[in-house]
Amino acid sequence: MRYLELGCISKTNKLFQKLQDLNPLLNIEIEAYSCKSSRRQRGRFVEKPLGYLLSALELRFPDYDFCGESWGSFRRKTLAEVLNEMTYSISTTHKNSDDVKEFVGFLEVILHRSVSLGGCEIFSYENRMGPFEDCLWYFSFLFFNKKQRRVVMLNAFMSRS
């Protein structure tokens, strides 16, 4: 797998950085990866969708080892569930519900531009250990589009301090 530089994601991450400057405990980012396996990844015998999800996590969080992870660390989600979870989590940091709804709607548009949501399988990474163990809340959604051979990862978390 390799990181994909997509214009809409780069611009969105710059906007997220401005939000993080206002609230340093909040971290939100989107990244896209191609699903072309490297030689090292081809040597592993892991189901393809799971292998792609784990590879994306490894690229984003190189300090953590995801080799022992299985399907038990992931949950399938619908787009409605993802949007509800994002709305709930972000509303804990920003009380204006209209702003939160607008923000989540903006994220949905960016995700749709990055990876066609209609053809996606959506997974949530559920393991509290590793990169998210010291967070008040977090979500890590992985959008896998087999046809586009792409994984888009949306991570957000609120640090404790």
Swiss-Prot record:
UniProt GO MF annotations: RNA polymerase III core binding
Q: Which InterPro entries match?
A: Maf1, Maf1_sf
Query: What Gene3D superfamilies does the entry give?
Result: Repressor of RNA polymerase III transcription Maf1
Coiled-coil annotation: which residues?
A: none
Name of one Pfam family that matches: Maf1
Question: Which processes are annotated in GO (biological process)?
Answer: negative regulation of transcription by RNA polymerase III
Q: Name one GO cellular component term.
A: nucleus
Entry-linked PANTHER family: REPRESSOR OF RNA POLYMERASE III TRANSCRIPTION MAF1 (PTHR22504), REPRESSOR OF RNA POLYMERASE III TRANSCRIPTION MAF1 HOMOLOG (PTHR22504:SF0)
The name this protein carries in UniProt is: Uncharacterized protein ECU10_0060/ECU11_2080i
